[in-house]
Structure formats: C-alpha cells, structure tokens
C-alpha cells in the first residue's frame, strides 16, 4: 500500500480506495505524488461537493442535503461510502447541532483533522459554509489539502 502523511493522519492507497492510518505501508510518498495516483473521474459526482468546502470550514449534513435535493440521512449514507476519506474531505460534514457525527476513521480522527485544518473553536466547529460544486477538480483537490 502506498501511503502519505496529511497532518495528523497517514493515508493509504490500495489502488481503489484510501484508508486512514493504514496498518502497513509498502512505500511513502509526498501528498502531491499521492494525489496523482487517484482517478477522480471514477468518483460519484455527489461527493465532489466536498471539495467546495474550504479548509478551515465545515458544512452540515442538512446543508449538504439541501444542495443535493435529498435527506440528511442519505448524505450520511453517501459519506460513509466515500472511497477517498481525507482526500474527499467528508470529515468536514457535521451534524446540525455542530456535534461531529461519525467518521470512517473514528470520531477522534475526525476531530484531529478538523483541528489541523483550523475548523474548530475549542471542541466544536465554528465556521460553516454551504457546499458548492467546483469547476476544476484537480485544482480544488490540491487547494482542499493545502497544496495550492
């Protein structure tokens, strides 16, 4: 598995999906090189709205649902099936009461990621935006991870 560091976590890539804090890494690369391995064209387009949530901000399941025209519960289902956690930042989606909600890597990892990105005031998210569709996926991906 090829791995890269993003703030407090290691992200692993097995050729089809990413893993947060994988147990074994055969090779470590820089984050920019890691991103070049991923074919974003194969990703569910509804997940690309995640790239419209800037670093340091969060959105809620409800706001995300409004943009997609679906329910917050469906958004939770969609986030749970994100094949690229951290890369497509589903950790930036929180509950309407600003509690963190769930995360593939666990709530503590979600909290560490949000703190690393400057999205927390104390223990709670403090800057909320409505997700938006982006034009240039690659550019948004690099900006989302602080590489541009």
From Swiss-Prot:
The active site is at residue 90. GO terms for molecular function: methylated-DNA-[protein]-cysteine S-methyltransferase activity. Its EC number is 2.1.1.63. InterPro entries: MethylDNA_cys_MeTrfase_AS, MethylDNA_cys_MeTrfase_DNA-bd, MethylDNA_cys_MeTrfase_DNAb, WH-like_DNA-bd_sf. Involved in the cellular defense against the biological effects of O6-methylguanine (O6-MeG) and O4-methylthymine (O4-MeT) in DNA. Repairs the methylated nucleobase in DNA by stoichiometrically transferring the methyl group to a cysteine residue in the enzyme. This is a suicide reaction: the enzyme is irreversibly inactivated. Belongs to the MGMT family. This is Methylated-DNA--protein-cysteine methyltransferase. It comes from Pyrobaculum aerophilum (strain ATCC 51768 / DSM 7523 / JCM 9630 / CIP 104966 / NBRC 100827 / IM2). The lineage of its organism: Archaea, Thermoproteota, Thermoprotei, Thermoproteales, Thermoproteaceae.
